[in-house]
Amino acid sequence: MPKMKTKKSAAKRFKVRAGGSIKRSQAFKRHILTKKTTKNKRQLRGVAAVHASDMVSVRVMLPYA
């Protein structure tokens, strides 16, 4: 059986933590930032965890992570 391929777009967006949870970056931070408040932009910094309902989909896309 051939090797499973990693979805490269998912590999660039997600990283697996040591405990097994998957981290992702926040959305809505790329452009159109002038109308967003400073507080809103500050809260969009950093990383967030992938929700449990999306975990199976992400794991399928990252078979070797």
Curated annotation (Swiss-Prot):
Q: Could you tell me which cysteines form disulfide bridges?
A: none
Which keywords belong to this entry?
Ribonucleoprotein, Ribosomal protein
One GO MF term attached to the UniProt entry: structural constituent of ribosome
| Protein's UniProt keywords contain Ribonucleoprotein | yes
> Which terms under GO biological process does the entry name?
translation
Which Pfam families would you find in this protein's record? Ribosomal_L35p
Q: Which InterPro entries match?
A: Ribosomal_bL35, Ribosomal_bL35-like, Ribosomal_bL35_CS, Ribosomal_bL35_sf
One GO cellular-component annotation of the UniProt record comes to: cytosolic large ribosomal subunit
- Which family does the UniProt entry place this protein in? Belongs to the bacterial ribosomal protein bL35 family.
Q: What is this protein called?
A: Large ribosomal subunit protein bL35
